């Protein structure tokens, strides 16, 4: 499921993962997956289903990702749209 999604995502956003890894070399594969889902506009409950997590876990992962990316006041969605 992820492999198919990733293949389709890369067709639409060919440099997304490369740019994200350049901006944050320590980003994990799981965080990249979360970023891709967020970039497509998925809501937390849908992301939770895709990742087999609870929606609260997705919120925590998003918070940790914001910290890792040092976003300050910029929203994660806006940041990812700009990549």
Segments (PLM) and residue ranges:
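Cytosolic nucleotide-binding catalytic cores of signal-transduction proteins
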Residues: 2-83
